[in-house]
Swiss-Prot record:
Homodimer. It comes from Clostridium perfringens (strain ATCC 13124 / DSM 756 / JCM 1290 / NCIMB 6125 / NCTC 8237 / Type A). Mg(2+) 2 binds at E418. One of its GO terms (biological process) is lysyl-tRNA aminoacylation. This is Lysine--tRNA ligase. Its cofactor is Mg(2+). Keywords: Aminoacyl-tRNA synthetase, ATP-binding, Cytoplasm, Ligase, Magnesium, Metal-binding, Nucleotide-binding, Protein biosynthesis. InterPro entries: Aa-tRNA-synt_II, aa-tRNA-synth_II, aa-tRNA-synth_II/BPL/LPL, Lys-tRNA-ligase_II, Lys-tRNA-ligase_II_N, Lys-tRNA-synth_II_C, NA-bd_OB-fold, NA-bd_OB_tRNA. CDD domains: LysRS_core, LysRS_N. Its EC number is 6.1.1.6. It holds the Pfam family tRNA_anti-codon.
Amino acid sequence: MSNEEINIHEAEEQLSEQEMLRRQKLAELQEAGKDPFDVYKVERTHSSADVKDNFEELEGKEVKVAGRLMSKRGQGKVVFADLADLPGKIQLFIKIDNVGEEALKEFKTFDLGDWVAATGEVFKTKMGEVSVKVTSFELICKSLKPLPEKWHGLKDPDLRYRQREVDIITNPEVKDTFIKRSQIVKAIREFLDNRGFLEVDTPILSPIAGGAAARPFITHHNALDIDMYLRIATELYLKRLIVAGFEKVYEMGKNFRNEGVSVRHNPEFTAIELYEAYADYNDMMEIMENMIAYVCEKVNGSTKVTYEGTEIDFTPPWRRITMVDAVKEFAGIDFNEIKSDEEAQAIAKEKNLEFPKPLDKVTKGEVLNMLFEEYGEDKLIQPTFLIDYPVEISPLTKKKRGNEMFTERFEGFVYGREVCNAYSELNDPIVQRERFEQQAREREYGDDEAYMLDEEFMSALETGMPPTGGLGIGIDRMIMFLTDSSSIRDVILFPTMKPQK
């Protein structure tokens, strides 16, 4: 016996009784010249929704429907069956008088999960259900694996994420979530396109991981013999397009960060960044709150949504609060009274705050930010713009007009979670280089999420970038709120999972 034959034999031993029976049925069909895998195309005339929505027009007329067999009922001379397609399901009525004895017998051998095409007349049963009175049918795909038990579906979260296709088949609400996700993404594009923004594509592989404070994925380009990074943000390339003269640009796509996995974080995630010439962070606030209101109305019919039992009101305007005021409100510490880094470090020590570098290297602004994260972030339930971040943690941002300790930066928070980040973009190349050099020192102190110096971006900035507003939004997190999903994995079709042993 060859190694290949041994492997096949071992695989067969691992099959369940149901799987073996299904393979036996397939072999019998193939022997009879009815191989379902020889079907190349199905001339479906109507979906389940088409038939139901247009019953008065279609009653008594012939249609051809197709879908996955989800249930069978009845014996003897009549069988009822449900076919599921994307919009929903349609009931089939298979009677011996209409299809013949042999065909009815064949239909009864079909397994749940099989794909079937059926032709027949549209009618309504005595129970009032719109159905198809089948005159002919065809098995168009044989399911060799049984679906999870009907009434329990696929409930184990780990299995649901690993076998998303089965999850969608057995849990219709999961399918609805991803249909809504598509609608949300479409509405975001629609809003920006209507405002004159141009959608662009920038590199996913880059020689520099720039535009955000995050740990990147590193790969190697064999032909060029250089290390490259999966992008952590699209910011620097998009700003180069503003330099080029594109006045309103956006990109929606995947970013990658080599960091932890949690209910809020997936290493591969969808984000959108947009940049507008001649605008500032106030304009970005207006865009953010009006875009989300537009999307909510378009997809949910209201600017109010319920998330984990709490009503969230996305009606503009959102609350605005400075980071200093938030720390004063939630931590009881007035940073207007803190005059030095040493005073801030003493507070950090008292509060047991942890930093990725020695405490004596930590600045006043970094302590302020950490205090907000510890005491204020989870308190911002209703949509809120936290504005005016310390300059030390905002290396790509212009300083605040009238107060050079801070920058014109905001982050949007909903239900205690960050959903967006925006700036009045720094366009002074001399100051920008100084900021990058400071970030290089942060990396020396052990902060591997500090920004890298990108000389190509610096060259572009030296060519001249007009005053610009920029906004980045975590699409997955926004979708969580609009679909009432508690985990980011619930809104990503195939989330990152640890391989099974």
